[in-house]
């Protein structure tokens, strides 16, 4: 109305008034009309907009409670604001829109070319990464093995997901995918849920008593004599009686000869440790593994693992039991459901090589998707411990001596600094296992295996059958385990120290007599001997008291200078090696080894280390350090590396 009145007044003025002296008056009035009209329209628009927004706000319900319910609260650890504007900027929104556009293009292309496209989520308004998560989960269950492997690899490489998206996969993935993620080097630990709560112990019970009950529930008849002994000791009435029964006997674990410096000291044993050692032996029998699982052994072992985080020896024995149980595929689902994969996924990333290697063995036995081989107790893969796209072209096997170990025998040479301090140092300064730290980097196409044969039976030597400790028995047992691990399917180089070299010779001789083992003979490319007593050792003759403390009696007889068994082994091996196309390299010590503060002995002299084949290189070190290079560019390591590369040159080139 006001606008119409104003226009009428203006028209009357123009009609009744005399003509203006200037034409500018007319245009000034027009401009005033336009200004007034524009202001009126703009003000009205703002008012109407405000009223509409106010009305919409008053009619909108608060859905915060509903949104909270939609969050993955049961697995989402750290909550975030529901206001998307707080979390996502322009860059995120642009990337999101770009991803949507790409997905539409791919879907269109798939329709045009009639190709496969998972369009399950193409019409659903969800987060871009949520779509990727569910697509990967669907892909991980594909019937195509290559697609499953690719899905696991893509999951392990994810770095941009939210916390709840990792938890979605942890909650929704199957056993095969979870194991694959645990064996993927770059996997985020958020893929693995915490193990389920452990059942409460019975009233007035303890882990020690539960272990005894578990051990007592296992079959006690038709067992090996040594397993019966282990079980009887573990079921003794008290830890004091265990220590008394163990009294003064020697344990051949760890570093070997250095322990001889403390003849009068005997490690104190606990009931739990004895029970675990007995369970290790029982777990080598498949039917006993079923009993352990049925009687709650997996949960009990997990409780012990958590209670003894500061005791590596306890944890290693638990891992050995678990690795043995994982050899039985029908137990895989139970092992995964019990939460062990989460623990193993963390352990395999440990900086401590022994802990990581034990976890790697168990996970490899669980991973039937990519690992056809089975790793029995005492067979440890040092490289590769994760899934890898690197083709493995050859195997290098490390066999320690009688008083050695699968890891410590192959450590870097010790200095005056304490070994426990070295472990915490940077790996470039000191390594506790040079085959894993050095050789794996220099030759990534190798599978590196370290073997440990069971010498702990020497603790109860009076009750165990003597043939178990013979070179023949040990070699047959190791040969069986190595063949199960796929040794012989690829070219092989053997690396041995001390008595380990005698075992290698005996294994090759035994393999040559069995048609099913011929692949090991045909694929052997070379052997390295570090101070191997081919013709016996003076250590066995030095002193009756010392020799029985250092070696079980049968080993003393077999390692005696010019013993009949040793001579037969040497002659048979030379005859066997005549027409075989493999290389041989021998190192020998030139310095005596100190045993105690007043005794020093040249353990393997030059003439005993001479096999009669290949090169023999004297090195100015003692018997313990002959297989422990001082550093990576030391002669010992560089010559070993050169030999391995030369022996496998043709195989590594292919």
Swiss-Prot record:
Coiled coil: none
Cell compartments where the protein resides: Mitochondrion membrane; Endoplasmic reticulum; Mitochondrion
Membrane topology, from the record: Single-pass membrane protein
A Gene Ontology BP annotation from the UniProt entry: phospholipid biosynthetic process
TM helices/strands, residue ranges: 32-54
Chief place of localization: mitochondrion
Family according to the record: Belongs to the SERAC1 family.
Function field: Facilitates the transport of serine from the cytosol to the mitochondria by interacting with and stabilizing Sideroflexin-1 (SFXN1), a mitochondrial serine transporter, playing a fundamental role in the one-carbon cycle responsible for the synthesis of nucleotides needed for mitochondrial DNA replication. Plays an important role in the phosphatidylglycerol (PG) remodeling that is essential for both mitochondrial function and intracellular cholesterol trafficking.
Name this protein carries in UniProt: Protein SERAC1
Species: Bos taurus (Bovine)
Gene giving rise to this polypeptide: SERAC1
């Amino acid at each position: 109305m006001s606008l119409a009145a104003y226009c009428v007044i203006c028209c009357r003025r123009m009609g009744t008034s005399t003509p203006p002296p200037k034409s500018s008056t007319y245009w000034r009035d027009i401009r005033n009309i336009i200004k007034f009209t524009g202001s009126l329209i703009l003000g009205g628009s703002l008012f109407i907009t405000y009223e509409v927004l106010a009305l919409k706000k008053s009619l909108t319900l608060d859905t915060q409670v509903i949104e909270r319910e939609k969050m993955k609260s049961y697995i989402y650890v750290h909550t975030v604001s529901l206001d998307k504007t707080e979390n996502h900027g322009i860059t995120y929104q642009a990337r999101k829109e770009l991803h949507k556009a790409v997905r539409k293009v791919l879907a269109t292309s798939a329709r045009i070319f009639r190709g496969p496209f998972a369009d399950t989520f193409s019409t659903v308004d969800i987060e871009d990464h949520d779509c990727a998560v569910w697509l990967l989960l669907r892909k991980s269950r594909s019937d195509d093995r290559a697609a499953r492997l690719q899905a696991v690899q893509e999951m392990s490489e994810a770095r941009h997901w939210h916390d709840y998206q990792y938890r979605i996969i942890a909650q929704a993935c199957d056993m095969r995918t979870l194991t694959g993620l645990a064996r993927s080097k770059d996997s985020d630990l958020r893929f693995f849920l915490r193990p389920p709560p452990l059942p409460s112990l019975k009233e007035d019970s303890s882990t020690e008593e539960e272990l005894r009950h578990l051990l007592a529930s296992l079959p006690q008849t038709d067992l090996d004599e040594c397993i019966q002994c282990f079980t009887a000791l573990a079921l003794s009435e008290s830890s004091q009686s265990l220590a008394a029964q163990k009294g003064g006997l020697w344990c051949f674990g760890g570093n070997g000869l250095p322990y001889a410096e403390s003849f009068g000291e005997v490690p104190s044993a606990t009931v739990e440790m004895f029970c675990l050692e007995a369970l290790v032996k029982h777990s080598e029998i498949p039917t006993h593994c079923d009993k352990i699982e049925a009687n709650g052994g997996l949960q009990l072992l997990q409780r012990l693992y958590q209670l003894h985080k500061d005791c590596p020896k306890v944890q290693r024995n638990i891992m050995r039991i678990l690795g043995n149980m994982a050899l039985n595929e029908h137990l895989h689902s139970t092992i995964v459901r019990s939460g062990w994969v989460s623990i193993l996924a963390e352990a395999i990333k440990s900086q401590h090589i022994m802990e990581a290697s034990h976890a790697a063995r168990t996970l490899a036995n669980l991973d039937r998707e990519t690992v056809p081989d089975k790793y029995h107790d005492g067979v440890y893969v040092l490289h590769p411990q994760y899934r890898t796209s690197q083709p493995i072209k050859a195997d290098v096997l490390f066999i320690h001596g009688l008083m050695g170990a699968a890891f410590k025998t192959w450590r870097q040479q010790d200095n005056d600094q304490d070994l426990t301090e070295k472990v915490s140092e940077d790996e470039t300064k000191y390594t506790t296992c040079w085959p894993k730290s050095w050789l794996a980097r220099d030759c990534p196409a190798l599978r590196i295996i370290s073997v440990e044969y069971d010498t702990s039976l020497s603790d109860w030597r009076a009750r165990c059958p003597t043939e178990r400790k013979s070179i023949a028995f040990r070699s047959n047992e190791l040969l069986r385990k190595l063949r199960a691990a796929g040794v012989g399917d690829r070219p092989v180089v053997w690396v041995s120290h001390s008595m380990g070299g005698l075992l290698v010779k005996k294994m090759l001789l035994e393999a040559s007599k069995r048609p099913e083992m011929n692949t090991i003979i045909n694929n052997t490319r070379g052997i390295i001997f570090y101070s191997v007593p081919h013709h016996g050792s003076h250590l066995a003759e030095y002193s009756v008291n010392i020799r029985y403390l250092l070696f079980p009696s049968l080993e003393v007889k077999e390692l005696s200078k010019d013993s009949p068994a040793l001579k037969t082994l040497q002659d048979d091996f030379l005859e066997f090696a005549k027409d075989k196309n493999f290389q041989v390299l021998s190192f020998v010590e030139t310095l005596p080894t100190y045993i105690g503060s007043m005794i020093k002995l040249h353990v393997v002299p030059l003439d005993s280390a001479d096999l009669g084949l290949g090169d023999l290189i004297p090195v100015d070190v003692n018997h313990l350090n002959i297989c422990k290079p001082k550093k990576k560019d030391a002669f010992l390591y560089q010559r070993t590396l050169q030999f391995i590369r030369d022996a496998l040159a043709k195989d590594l080139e292919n």
